[in-house]
Amino acid sequence: MLNGAQALVKMLENHGVTHVFGIPGAKVDSLFIALLDSPIELVLCRHEQNAVFMDQAFGRLTGKVGVCVVTSGPGVTNLVTGLVTATSEGDPVLAIGGEVPLDDRIKRTHQALDGVDVMKPVTKYAQSALTIHSLPEVFGNAVRAAESGRPGAVFLGLPKDVGLADFPGEISPLWGRSAPCGPAASSELQRAALLINAARRPLVLMGLQASQPASADAIKRFLAATGLPYAATFQGPGGWAAASQYAGKLGLFRNQPADRLLDDADCVITVGFDPIEFDPSLWNSGKSRPLVAIDGQAIDQDQAFLPQVELIGDLDASLEALAPLLQVQVEEAFRRSADAEAAELAATVAEGAQLGGMPVHPLRVVHELQQVVTPDTTVALDVGSHYIWMSRYFATGHARQVLVSNGQQTLGVALPWAMAANLLRPDQPVISVSGDGGFLFTATELETAKRLGSRFVHLIWNSASYDMVEFQEQAHYGRIAGVKLGHYDVEAFAAAFGCKGYRINDADQLGPVLREALQADCPVLIDIPIDYSDNLKLMQNVHQDFIH
Protein backbone atom coordinates (compact mmCIF):
# COMPACT_ATOMS: atom_id res chain seq x y z
CA MET A 1 0.00 0.00 0.00
CA LEU A 2 1.24 3.49 -0.84
CA ASN A 3 1.58 6.18 1.77
CA GLY A 4 0.37 9.74 1.20
CA ALA A 5 3.71 10.98 -0.11
CA GLN A 6 3.99 8.09 -2.57
CA ALA A 7 0.42 8.67 -3.72
CA LEU A 8 1.13 12.36 -4.29
CA VAL A 9 4.19 11.50 -6.38
CA LYS A 10 2.02 9.14 -8.43
CA MET A 11 -0.46 11.97 -9.05
CA LEU A 12 2.41 14.16 -10.25
CA GLU A 13 3.55 11.39 -12.60
CA ASN A 14 0.02 10.98 -13.96
CA HIS A 15 -0.05 14.70 -14.71
CA GLY A 16 3.16 14.50 -16.74
CA VAL A 17 5.46 16.24 -14.26
CA THR A 18 9.12 15.61 -15.15
CA HIS A 19 10.99 17.71 -12.58
CA VAL A 20 10.45 18.73 -8.97
CA PHE A 21 12.50 21.56 -7.48
CA GLY A 22 13.01 22.05 -3.78
CA ILE A 23 14.89 21.96 -0.51
CA PRO A 24 14.42 19.10 1.99
CA GLY A 25 13.30 19.16 5.60
CA ALA A 26 11.79 16.87 8.21
CA LYS A 27 8.17 17.65 7.29
CA VAL A 28 8.64 16.63 3.64
CA ASP A 29 11.30 13.93 3.88
CA SER A 30 8.67 11.30 3.01
CA LEU A 31 8.10 13.08 -0.33
CA PHE A 32 11.81 13.28 -1.08
CA ILE A 33 12.21 9.56 -0.34
CA ALA A 34 9.19 8.75 -2.52
CA LEU A 35 10.79 10.61 -5.43
CA LEU A 36 13.72 8.15 -5.30
CA ASP A 37 11.40 5.53 -6.81
CA SER A 38 9.94 7.86 -9.44
CA PRO A 39 11.10 8.85 -12.93
CA ILE A 40 10.57 12.47 -11.87
CA GLU A 41 13.93 14.25 -11.53
CA LEU A 42 14.48 15.94 -8.17
CA VAL A 43 16.43 19.21 -8.47
CA LEU A 44 17.97 20.30 -5.18
CA CYS A 45 18.13 24.11 -5.06
CA ARG A 46 19.95 26.62 -2.88
CA HIS A 47 16.89 28.70 -1.92
CA GLU A 48 13.16 28.07 -1.99
CA GLN A 49 12.46 31.31 -3.85
CA ASN A 50 14.75 30.22 -6.66
CA ALA A 51 13.00 26.85 -6.82
CA VAL A 52 9.75 28.71 -7.55
CA PHE A 53 11.45 30.83 -10.21
CA MET A 54 12.55 27.62 -11.94
CA ASP A 55 9.00 26.25 -11.68
CA GLN A 56 7.71 29.51 -13.13
CA ALA A 57 9.86 29.11 -16.23
CA PHE A 58 8.70 25.49 -16.61
CA GLY A 59 5.10 26.68 -16.41
CA ARG A 60 5.61 29.55 -18.82
CA LEU A 61 7.37 27.42 -21.42
CA THR A 62 5.13 24.33 -21.22
CA GLY A 63 1.73 25.57 -20.04
CA LYS A 64 1.77 22.84 -17.37
CA VAL A 65 2.48 23.29 -13.67
CA GLY A 66 6.03 23.55 -12.46
CA VAL A 67 6.33 21.85 -9.07
CA CYS A 68 8.39 22.62 -5.98
CA VAL A 69 8.55 20.96 -2.54
CA VAL A 70 9.70 22.75 0.61
CA THR A 71 9.58 22.14 4.33
CA SER A 72 7.44 23.93 6.91
CA GLY A 73 8.02 27.31 8.54
CA PRO A 74 10.74 29.31 6.77
CA GLY A 75 10.68 26.90 3.86
CA VAL A 76 7.11 27.95 3.17
CA THR A 77 7.58 31.66 3.83
CA ASN A 78 10.54 31.75 1.44
CA LEU A 79 8.13 30.84 -1.37
CA VAL A 80 6.14 34.06 -1.22
CA THR A 81 8.08 36.26 -3.68
CA GLY A 82 8.27 33.49 -6.26
CA LEU A 83 4.59 32.64 -5.99
CA VAL A 84 3.34 36.22 -6.24
CA THR A 85 5.56 36.64 -9.31
CA ALA A 86 4.08 33.53 -10.93
CA THR A 87 0.49 34.50 -10.12
CA SER A 88 0.94 38.08 -11.32
CA GLU A 89 2.50 36.93 -14.58
CA GLY A 90 0.18 34.05 -15.45
CA ASP A 91 2.54 31.12 -14.89
CA PRO A 92 1.19 27.82 -13.50
CA VAL A 93 3.10 26.67 -10.40
CA LEU A 94 2.25 24.07 -7.74
CA ALA A 95 4.05 24.63 -4.44
CA ILE A 96 3.88 21.77 -1.94
CA GLY A 97 4.74 22.87 1.57
CA GLY A 98 5.35 20.62 4.53
CA GLU A 99 3.36 21.16 7.72
CA VAL A 100 3.58 20.01 11.32
CA PRO A 101 1.55 16.89 12.26
CA LEU A 102 -2.18 17.48 12.66
CA ASP A 103 -2.08 17.29 16.47
CA ASP A 104 0.50 20.10 16.55
CA ARG A 105 -1.38 22.57 14.34
CA ILE A 106 -2.91 24.44 17.29
CA LYS A 107 0.28 24.40 19.40
CA ARG A 108 3.10 26.91 19.65
CA THR A 109 5.71 24.47 18.42
CA HIS A 110 8.72 24.21 16.12
CA GLN A 111 7.97 25.51 12.61
CA ALA A 112 4.21 25.61 13.22
CA LEU A 113 2.65 28.01 10.73
CA ASP A 114 -0.68 28.43 8.98
CA GLY A 115 0.80 28.20 5.51
CA VAL A 116 -2.59 28.48 3.83
CA ASP A 117 -3.23 31.91 5.34
CA VAL A 118 0.24 33.02 4.29
CA MET A 119 -0.33 31.83 0.73
CA LYS A 120 -3.88 33.01 0.03
CA PRO A 121 -2.92 36.55 -1.06
CA VAL A 122 -0.24 35.34 -3.50
CA THR A 123 -1.92 32.30 -5.09
CA LYS A 124 -5.08 31.35 -6.96
CA TYR A 125 -5.77 28.46 -4.58
CA ALA A 126 -4.31 27.46 -1.22
CA GLN A 127 -5.43 24.48 0.85
CA SER A 128 -4.00 21.84 3.15
CA ALA A 129 -4.76 18.14 2.81
CA LEU A 130 -5.94 17.58 6.38
CA THR A 131 -6.85 13.92 5.80
CA ILE A 132 -5.42 11.21 3.58
CA HIS A 133 -8.82 10.97 1.86
CA SER A 134 -8.79 14.65 0.90
CA LEU A 135 -5.27 14.56 -0.57
CA PRO A 136 -6.29 13.79 -4.19
CA GLU A 137 -9.10 16.35 -4.00
CA VAL A 138 -6.79 19.12 -2.85
CA PHE A 139 -4.21 18.11 -5.46
CA GLY A 140 -6.76 17.99 -8.29
CA ASN A 141 -8.38 21.32 -7.48
CA ALA A 142 -4.99 22.98 -7.00
CA VAL A 143 -3.65 21.87 -10.37
CA ARG A 144 -6.88 22.78 -12.18
CA ALA A 145 -6.78 26.25 -10.63
CA ALA A 146 -3.13 26.70 -11.61
CA GLU A 147 -3.65 25.77 -15.26
CA SER A 148 -7.14 27.17 -15.95
CA GLY A 149 -8.32 30.64 -16.96
CA ARG A 150 -5.46 33.00 -16.35
CA PRO A 151 -2.82 30.60 -14.95
CA GLY A 152 -1.00 31.21 -11.68
CA ALA A 153 0.48 29.71 -8.54
CA VAL A 154 -1.27 27.38 -6.09
CA PHE A 155 -0.28 25.94 -2.71
CA LEU A 156 -0.85 22.47 -1.27
CA GLY A 157 -0.06 22.01 2.43
CA LEU A 158 1.00 18.48 3.43
CA PRO A 159 1.02 17.68 7.17
CA LYS A 160 3.80 15.26 8.04
CA ASP A 161 1.46 12.54 9.30
CA VAL A 162 -0.76 12.76 6.20
CA GLY A 163 2.33 12.15 4.08
CA LEU A 164 3.05 9.00 6.09
CA ALA A 165 -0.53 7.70 6.33
CA ASP A 166 -1.70 4.72 4.26
CA PHE A 167 -3.44 5.81 1.07
CA PRO A 168 -6.63 3.83 0.40
CA GLY A 169 -7.66 2.71 -3.08
CA GLU A 170 -6.48 3.48 -6.60
CA ILE A 171 -5.26 6.82 -7.94
CA SER A 172 -7.37 8.07 -10.82
CA PRO A 173 -5.53 9.75 -13.71
CA LEU A 174 -8.40 12.27 -13.80
CA TRP A 175 -7.13 14.16 -10.74
CA GLY A 176 -5.92 17.56 -11.94
CA ARG A 177 -7.13 17.21 -15.51
CA SER A 178 -8.36 20.55 -16.87
CA ALA A 179 -11.60 20.85 -18.83
CA PRO A 180 -11.19 22.44 -22.29
CA CYS A 181 -13.22 25.57 -23.11
CA GLY A 182 -14.87 26.59 -26.35
CA PRO A 183 -14.99 29.99 -28.06
CA ALA A 184 -16.80 33.03 -26.71
CA ALA A 185 -20.57 33.23 -27.08
CA SER A 186 -21.80 33.72 -30.64
CA SER A 187 -23.85 36.79 -29.71
CA GLU A 188 -20.77 38.47 -28.21
CA LEU A 189 -18.68 37.62 -31.26
CA GLN A 190 -21.27 39.37 -33.45
CA ARG A 191 -21.27 42.46 -31.18
CA ALA A 192 -17.47 42.58 -31.25
CA ALA A 193 -17.42 42.34 -35.04
CA LEU A 194 -19.84 45.28 -35.36
CA LEU A 195 -17.61 47.50 -33.22
CA ILE A 196 -14.38 46.50 -34.94
CA ASN A 197 -15.81 46.74 -38.46
CA ALA A 198 -17.02 50.27 -37.73
CA ALA A 199 -13.50 51.37 -36.79
CA ARG A 200 -11.07 53.00 -39.21
CA ARG A 201 -8.03 53.05 -36.95
CA PRO A 202 -8.24 49.73 -35.07
CA LEU A 203 -5.25 48.40 -33.14
CA VAL A 204 -4.79 44.97 -31.58
CA LEU A 205 -3.02 45.11 -28.21
CA MET A 206 -1.41 41.73 -27.50
CA GLY A 207 -0.73 40.81 -23.87
CA LEU A 208 1.11 38.09 -21.99
CA GLN A 209 -1.50 35.35 -22.46
CA ALA A 210 -1.40 35.88 -26.23
CA SER A 211 2.25 34.80 -26.18
CA GLN A 212 1.59 31.24 -25.01
CA PRO A 213 3.35 28.82 -27.38
CA ALA A 214 0.13 26.83 -27.79
CA SER A 215 -1.61 29.96 -29.14
CA ALA A 216 1.09 30.98 -31.62
CA ASP A 217 -0.54 29.48 -34.71
CA ALA A 218 -3.96 30.90 -33.86
CA ILE A 219 -2.46 34.37 -33.35
CA LYS A 220 -0.68 34.20 -36.71
CA ARG A 221 -3.83 33.05 -38.52
CA PHE A 222 -5.94 35.80 -36.95
CA LEU A 223 -3.50 38.55 -37.91
CA ALA A 224 -3.04 37.16 -41.43
CA ALA A 225 -6.79 36.86 -41.99
CA THR A 226 -7.69 40.32 -40.68
CA GLY A 227 -4.64 42.39 -41.67
CA LEU A 228 -5.02 44.39 -38.45
CA PRO A 229 -2.00 46.30 -37.12
CA TYR A 230 -0.89 45.24 -33.66
CA ALA A 231 1.38 46.22 -30.80
CA ALA A 232 2.41 44.18 -27.78
CA THR A 233 3.30 44.56 -24.13
CA PHE A 234 6.79 43.50 -23.05
CA GLN A 235 5.44 39.97 -22.48
CA GLY A 236 3.22 39.89 -25.56
CA PRO A 237 3.96 38.45 -29.03
CA GLY A 238 6.66 40.27 -31.00
CA GLY A 239 7.20 40.67 -34.72
CA TRP A 240 7.26 36.90 -35.26
CA ALA A 241 3.45 36.86 -35.38
CA ALA A 242 3.11 39.16 -38.42
CA ALA A 243 6.14 41.33 -39.11
CA SER A 244 4.49 43.63 -41.65
CA GLN A 245 1.66 44.51 -39.22
CA TYR A 246 3.80 44.89 -36.09
CA ALA A 247 4.19 48.38 -34.61
CA GLY A 248 6.46 47.38 -31.73
CA LYS A 249 6.39 47.00 -27.96
CA LEU A 250 4.74 49.45 -25.62
CA GLY A 251 4.48 49.98 -21.91
CA LEU A 252 6.30 51.38 -18.89
CA PHE A 253 6.94 54.97 -20.03
CA ARG A 254 4.38 55.38 -22.83
CA ASN A 255 6.80 57.03 -25.23
CA GLN A 256 7.45 54.37 -27.85
CA PRO A 257 6.42 54.49 -31.54
CA ALA A 258 3.69 51.94 -30.81
CA ASP A 259 2.36 54.15 -28.00
CA ARG A 260 1.65 56.92 -30.51
CA LEU A 261 -0.34 54.47 -32.61
CA LEU A 262 -2.26 53.34 -29.53
CA ASP A 263 -3.12 56.96 -28.74
CA ASP A 264 -4.53 57.48 -32.23
CA ALA A 265 -6.52 54.23 -32.44
CA ASP A 266 -10.32 54.56 -32.57
CA CYS A 267 -10.88 50.98 -31.38
CA VAL A 268 -8.57 48.79 -29.29
CA ILE A 269 -8.85 45.00 -29.32
CA THR A 270 -6.95 43.50 -26.40
CA VAL A 271 -5.91 39.85 -26.66
CA GLY A 272 -4.75 38.09 -23.49
CA PHE A 273 -4.01 41.48 -21.93
CA ASP A 274 -3.50 41.84 -18.17
CA PRO A 275 -3.64 45.37 -16.69
CA ILE A 276 -0.67 44.51 -14.48
CA GLU A 277 1.51 44.69 -17.61
CA PHE A 278 0.54 48.23 -18.63
CA ASP A 279 -1.87 50.17 -16.43
CA PRO A 280 -4.89 51.23 -18.53
CA SER A 281 -4.90 54.63 -16.82
CA LEU A 282 -1.67 55.35 -18.71
CA TRP A 283 -3.11 54.66 -22.15
CA ASN A 284 -6.90 54.88 -22.03
CA SER A 285 -7.91 57.54 -19.50
CA GLY A 286 -10.42 59.97 -20.93
CA LYS A 287 -10.82 57.97 -24.15
CA SER A 288 -14.33 57.37 -25.49
CA ARG A 289 -13.29 54.79 -28.08
CA PRO A 290 -14.70 51.24 -27.89
CA LEU A 291 -12.68 48.43 -26.32
CA VAL A 292 -13.01 44.73 -27.11
CA ALA A 293 -11.30 42.30 -24.71
CA ILE A 294 -10.52 38.73 -25.79
CA ASP A 295 -9.46 36.58 -22.85
CA GLY A 296 -9.75 33.27 -21.08
CA GLN A 297 -11.57 34.76 -18.11
CA ALA A 298 -13.54 37.88 -17.22
CA ILE A 299 -11.29 40.93 -17.09
CA ASP A 300 -10.69 43.03 -13.96
CA GLN A 301 -12.79 46.13 -14.54
CA ASP A 302 -11.04 49.48 -14.19
CA GLN A 303 -12.15 53.11 -14.57
CA ALA A 304 -9.96 53.22 -17.67
CA PHE A 305 -10.63 49.67 -18.84
CA LEU A 306 -14.34 48.96 -19.29
CA PRO A 307 -14.64 46.98 -22.55
CA GLN A 308 -17.94 47.26 -24.40
CA VAL A 309 -17.56 43.60 -25.35
CA GLU A 310 -15.70 40.77 -23.63
CA LEU A 311 -15.03 37.59 -25.59
CA ILE A 312 -14.47 35.09 -22.80
CA GLY A 313 -13.51 31.55 -23.72
CA ASP A 314 -10.64 29.63 -25.21
CA LEU A 315 -8.37 32.29 -26.70
CA ASP A 316 -7.53 30.34 -29.85
CA ALA A 317 -11.11 29.29 -30.51
CA SER A 318 -12.43 32.83 -30.01
CA LEU A 319 -9.89 34.27 -32.47
CA GLU A 320 -10.74 31.59 -35.04
CA ALA A 321 -14.45 32.36 -34.67
CA LEU A 322 -14.00 36.15 -34.82
CA ALA A 323 -11.71 36.41 -37.85
CA PRO A 324 -14.32 35.49 -40.54
CA LEU A 325 -16.69 38.13 -39.15
CA LEU A 326 -14.26 41.00 -39.63
CA GLN A 327 -14.30 43.19 -42.75
CA VAL A 328 -12.25 46.14 -41.55
CA GLN A 329 -11.40 49.07 -43.82
CA VAL A 330 -8.28 50.43 -42.13
CA GLU A 331 -7.58 54.09 -42.88
CA GLU A 332 -4.58 54.27 -45.21
CA ALA A 333 -2.99 57.06 -43.19
CA PHE A 334 -3.24 54.95 -40.05
CA ARG A 335 -1.70 51.97 -41.80
CA ARG A 336 1.14 54.16 -43.10
CA SER A 337 1.59 55.47 -39.58
CA ALA A 338 1.95 51.91 -38.32
CA ASP A 339 4.59 51.26 -40.98
CA ALA A 340 6.41 54.46 -40.02
CA GLU A 341 6.46 53.51 -36.34
CA ALA A 342 7.91 50.11 -37.22
CA ALA A 343 10.55 51.76 -39.43
CA GLU A 344 11.52 54.16 -36.64
CA LEU A 345 12.01 51.23 -34.30
CA ALA A 346 14.16 49.40 -36.86
CA ALA A 347 16.30 52.50 -37.41
CA THR A 348 17.01 52.80 -33.70
CA VAL A 349 18.01 49.14 -33.52
CA ALA A 350 20.34 49.56 -36.51
CA GLU A 351 22.32 52.21 -34.65
CA GLY A 352 23.67 49.51 -32.35
CA ALA A 353 26.09 48.06 -34.90
CA GLN A 354 27.97 51.37 -35.15
CA LEU A 355 28.38 52.05 -31.43
CA GLY A 356 31.92 51.28 -30.22
CA GLY A 357 34.12 52.26 -27.31
CA MET A 358 33.85 51.57 -23.61
CA PRO A 359 31.73 51.19 -21.59
CA VAL A 360 29.51 49.34 -24.05
CA HIS A 361 26.31 51.03 -25.22
CA PRO A 362 23.12 48.99 -24.60
CA LEU A 363 22.18 49.01 -28.29
CA ARG A 364 25.56 47.48 -29.16
CA VAL A 365 24.85 44.61 -26.76
CA VAL A 366 21.39 44.16 -28.29
CA HIS A 367 22.95 44.13 -31.76
CA GLU A 368 25.59 41.53 -30.85
CA LEU A 369 22.99 39.33 -29.17
CA GLN A 370 20.78 39.53 -32.24
CA GLN A 371 23.66 38.14 -34.32
CA VAL A 372 24.09 34.98 -32.22
CA VAL A 373 20.54 34.21 -31.12
CA THR A 374 19.05 31.44 -33.26
CA PRO A 375 15.34 30.60 -33.61
CA ASP A 376 15.70 27.87 -30.97
CA THR A 377 17.51 30.07 -28.42
CA THR A 378 15.72 31.00 -25.18
CA VAL A 379 16.56 34.42 -23.70
CA ALA A 380 15.76 35.11 -20.02
CA LEU A 381 15.75 38.71 -18.81
CA ASP A 382 16.11 39.94 -15.26
CA VAL A 383 14.70 43.32 -14.24
CA GLY A 384 16.66 46.55 -14.59
CA SER A 385 17.59 49.09 -17.23
CA HIS A 386 18.78 46.26 -19.47
CA TYR A 387 15.26 44.82 -19.55
CA ILE A 388 13.87 48.06 -21.01
CA TRP A 389 16.51 48.17 -23.76
CA MET A 390 16.09 44.47 -24.53
CA SER A 391 12.28 44.46 -24.43
CA ARG A 392 12.03 47.44 -26.76
CA TYR A 393 14.73 46.62 -29.28
CA PHE A 394 15.49 42.89 -29.29
CA ALA A 395 13.53 41.09 -32.02
CA THR A 396 11.98 37.77 -31.02
CA GLY A 397 11.60 34.82 -33.36
CA HIS A 398 8.81 32.82 -31.71
CA ALA A 399 6.38 32.68 -28.80
CA ARG A 400 8.04 33.15 -25.43
CA GLN A 401 11.51 33.12 -26.85
CA VAL A 402 12.22 35.94 -24.41
CA LEU A 403 11.14 35.55 -20.78
CA VAL A 404 10.62 38.72 -18.78
CA SER A 405 9.08 39.66 -15.42
CA ASN A 406 6.69 42.47 -16.30
CA GLY A 407 4.13 42.02 -13.52
CA GLN A 408 6.03 42.22 -10.25
CA GLN A 409 9.31 43.14 -11.99
CA THR A 410 11.08 40.72 -9.65
CA LEU A 411 14.86 40.93 -9.38
CA GLY A 412 16.88 37.75 -9.73
CA VAL A 413 14.66 35.69 -12.03
CA ALA A 414 16.98 35.43 -15.04
CA LEU A 415 19.51 32.88 -13.76
CA PRO A 416 16.91 30.39 -12.41
CA TRP A 417 14.85 30.80 -15.58
CA ALA A 418 17.91 30.03 -17.70
CA MET A 419 18.55 26.88 -15.67
CA ALA A 420 14.96 25.73 -16.13
CA ALA A 421 15.05 26.41 -19.87
CA ASN A 422 18.24 24.36 -20.16
CA LEU A 423 16.65 21.46 -18.26
CA LEU A 424 13.65 21.55 -20.58
CA ARG A 425 15.69 22.01 -23.76
CA PRO A 426 19.17 20.63 -23.09
CA ASP A 427 20.21 20.70 -26.74
CA GLN A 428 19.14 24.29 -27.40
CA PRO A 429 21.05 27.50 -26.56
CA VAL A 430 20.05 29.56 -23.54
CA ILE A 431 21.15 33.13 -22.80
CA SER A 432 20.20 35.11 -19.71
CA VAL A 433 20.75 38.78 -18.91
CA SER A 434 20.86 40.67 -15.63
CA GLY A 435 22.38 43.72 -14.03
CA ASP A 436 25.18 43.42 -11.51
CA GLY A 437 22.66 44.09 -8.73
CA GLY A 438 20.00 41.57 -9.73
CA PHE A 439 22.54 38.84 -10.50
CA LEU A 440 23.57 38.49 -6.85
CA PHE A 441 19.95 37.97 -5.75
CA THR A 442 20.06 34.39 -7.04
CA ALA A 443 23.73 33.81 -7.89
CA THR A 444 24.02 30.96 -5.36
CA GLU A 445 22.19 28.78 -7.88
CA LEU A 446 25.35 28.79 -9.98
CA GLU A 447 26.43 25.86 -7.81
CA THR A 448 23.17 24.09 -8.65
CA ALA A 449 23.71 24.77 -12.34
CA LYS A 450 27.23 23.37 -12.27
CA ARG A 451 26.08 20.29 -10.33
CA LEU A 452 23.34 19.65 -12.88
CA GLY A 453 25.71 20.02 -15.81
CA SER A 454 23.77 23.04 -17.10
CA ARG A 455 24.88 24.98 -20.17
CA PHE A 456 23.90 28.62 -20.61
CA VAL A 457 25.49 32.03 -21.05
CA HIS A 458 24.66 34.76 -18.54
CA LEU A 459 25.39 38.41 -19.39
CA ILE A 460 25.89 40.89 -16.54
CA TRP A 461 25.32 44.49 -17.63
CA ASN A 462 27.57 46.08 -15.03
CA SER A 463 26.95 49.64 -13.86
CA ALA A 464 27.76 49.18 -10.14
CA SER A 465 24.28 50.43 -9.32
CA TYR A 466 20.57 49.69 -9.28
CA ASP A 467 20.44 51.70 -12.46
CA MET A 468 16.76 51.41 -13.34
CA VAL A 469 15.94 53.07 -10.02
CA GLU A 470 18.81 55.54 -10.36
CA PHE A 471 17.74 57.10 -13.63
CA GLN A 472 14.11 57.33 -12.53
CA GLU A 473 15.13 59.04 -9.28
CA GLN A 474 17.28 61.44 -11.29
CA ALA A 475 14.39 62.22 -13.63
CA HIS A 476 11.86 62.64 -10.85
CA TYR A 477 13.85 64.34 -8.08
CA GLY A 478 17.04 65.61 -9.70
CA ARG A 479 19.20 63.55 -7.33
CA ILE A 480 19.68 59.92 -6.31
CA ALA A 481 19.71 57.84 -3.11
CA GLY A 482 20.40 54.22 -2.19
CA VAL A 483 21.42 52.98 -5.62
CA LYS A 484 25.23 52.82 -5.79
CA LEU A 485 26.86 49.38 -5.42
CA GLY A 486 30.40 48.05 -5.12
CA HIS A 487 32.29 46.10 -7.76
CA TYR A 488 32.99 42.36 -7.67
CA ASP A 489 35.16 40.11 -9.81
CA VAL A 490 32.78 38.21 -12.09
CA GLU A 491 35.54 35.99 -13.53
CA ALA A 492 36.68 34.93 -10.05
CA PHE A 493 33.08 34.39 -8.96
CA ALA A 494 32.46 32.07 -11.91
CA ALA A 495 35.71 30.18 -11.27
CA ALA A 496 34.75 29.60 -7.63
CA PHE A 497 31.86 27.44 -8.82
CA GLY A 498 33.82 25.68 -11.56
CA CYS A 499 32.25 27.83 -14.28
CA LYS A 500 33.78 30.11 -16.88
CA GLY A 501 33.92 33.90 -16.76
CA TYR A 502 34.84 36.71 -19.16
CA ARG A 503 35.19 40.47 -18.84
CA ILE A 504 34.62 42.67 -21.87
CA ASN A 505 37.31 45.36 -22.26
CA ASP A 506 36.35 46.53 -25.74
CA ALA A 507 32.97 46.55 -27.48
CA ASP A 508 34.45 44.66 -30.42
CA GLN A 509 35.25 41.73 -28.10
CA LEU A 510 31.62 41.07 -27.34
CA GLY A 511 30.63 39.21 -30.51
CA PRO A 512 33.60 36.78 -30.48
CA VAL A 513 33.24 36.18 -26.73
CA LEU A 514 29.53 35.40 -27.12
CA ARG A 515 30.24 32.87 -29.86
CA GLU A 516 32.96 31.20 -27.80
CA ALA A 517 30.80 31.15 -24.66
CA LEU A 518 27.93 29.45 -26.46
CA GLN A 519 30.23 26.51 -27.22
CA ALA A 520 31.22 25.98 -23.56
CA ASP A 521 30.15 22.85 -21.68
CA CYS A 522 29.40 24.72 -18.44
CA PRO A 523 27.64 27.90 -17.31
CA VAL A 524 29.40 31.05 -18.51
CA LEU A 525 29.28 34.56 -17.02
CA ILE A 526 30.16 37.60 -19.16
CA ASP A 527 30.84 40.87 -17.33
CA ILE A 528 29.96 43.84 -19.58
CA PRO A 529 30.74 47.35 -18.29
CA ILE A 530 27.72 49.21 -19.59
CA ASP A 531 27.18 52.81 -20.67
CA TYR A 532 23.78 53.90 -19.38
CA SER A 533 24.30 57.58 -20.17
CA ASP A 534 21.45 57.41 -22.71
CA ASN A 535 18.97 56.04 -20.19
CA LEU A 536 17.21 59.37 -19.76
CA LYS A 537 16.36 59.14 -23.46
CA LEU A 538 14.23 56.13 -22.53
CA MET A 539 11.96 58.60 -20.77
CA GLN A 540 11.89 61.46 -23.26
CA ASN A 541 8.45 63.06 -23.68
CA VAL A 542 7.18 61.26 -20.61
CA HIS A 543 4.69 62.74 -18.18
CA GLN A 544 5.83 62.51 -14.55
CA ASP A 545 2.87 60.26 -13.72
CA PHE A 546 4.38 57.59 -15.97
CA ILE A 547 7.50 57.27 -13.82
CA HIS A 548 7.03 54.16 -11.68
Regions from the PLM with identified roles:
Residues 127-130, 352, 502:
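Glycine- and charged-residue-rich phosphate/anionic-cofactor binding loop of Rossmann-like
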Residues 133, 169-171, 287-387, 507, ...:
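Phosphate/pyrophosphate-binding active-site segments
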Residues 5-8, 26, 31-32, 341-416, ...:
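Active-site diphosphate/adenylate-binding microenvironment
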Residues 23-25, 43-53, 68-75, 130-131, ...:
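Active-site nucleophile and cofactor-binding loops and adjacent substrate-binding regions
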Residues 66-68, 156, 379, 402, ...:
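Well-ordered beta-strand positions enriched in small/hydrophobic/aromatic, beta-favoring residues
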Residues 96, 105-111, 216, 302-304, ...:
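Thiamine diphosphate
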Residues 1-332, 368, 372-375, 455-458, ...:
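N-terminal alpha/beta PP-like core and its mobile active-site loop of ThDP/TPP-dependent enzymes
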Residues 28, 48-53, 276, 386-388, ...:
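Short acidic loop-to-helix transition motifs that present clustered carboxylates
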